[in-house]
Structure formats: structure tokens, C-alpha cells
């Protein structure tokens, strides 16, 4: 009886931990307007590559870069595990808006929801790097 309860509790804990884990697939399928947003007056053809550079300069590793459509870039990046963190996933969406401005949205997910030592929001460092890169190109 005790063994059955222990196995049941272990299974329940494993399911809870797995369910709380973020994945790149989950990040890709989140709404494109999720996250912190900043608008830029530069063209999409300039902001897209600059956003990728900004992600790298912020200390993240780029996993994939895709274009869901002709007016949108999606960058998926990761911050690896460390002594104090299980890591994080970051999605940057760069999209042309109808008024010709380019919206950059940064959405961050902790790999494990209970990971309180993770940064939690990479928008500040990414926007800071993007501002520097775009300012240098002007």
C-alpha cells in the first residue's frame, strides 16, 4: 500500500513538473502580440536582422529564426541552465504594422514555472541592444 502511494505521488509530481515546463513549441504557438512591445520607425528589412543581433548581444542563444509570413519575423532564443536557474525561453516577434511602423515584441517564459531565480523578462536588455544597433546603423 505504501509503495503504491509513493509511486502515485511520484507520478503526480512528475506530471506537475512536466506540465509546468515551457517548450519552444508552446512559445511558437503563443499569440504573436504577447509580451512587451516597442515600435520602431526603421523598415522591417532592417529591424528583423537587428533584432537577431540584439538577442545575441543580450546574452541569449538563438535557436530558430523564421518568417511566419512576409511581414513577420519570429526569433526563438534560449538562456541555458545555470547553477541558479533551469533556463529560459525567449520569443521575439518583429512585425510590420499597417501604419508602417515595425513592432518588436519580446515574450519570455521560464523553462520551469517554479524557477524564481530566472530573469523572467528579457525585453529590457533586448530593447536596449536593439536601440544601440539601430542607432549605429543611422
Where are the predicted features?
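Flanking scaffold residues of small Cys/His-coordinated metal-binding clusters
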Residues: 13
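C-terminal motif of bacterial Sec signal peptides marking the signal peptidase cleavage site
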Residues: 17-20
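Ser/Thr-rich, low-complexity intrinsically disordered terminal regions
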Residues: 22-138
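Bacterial N-terminal signal peptides that target proteins for export
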Residues: 1-10
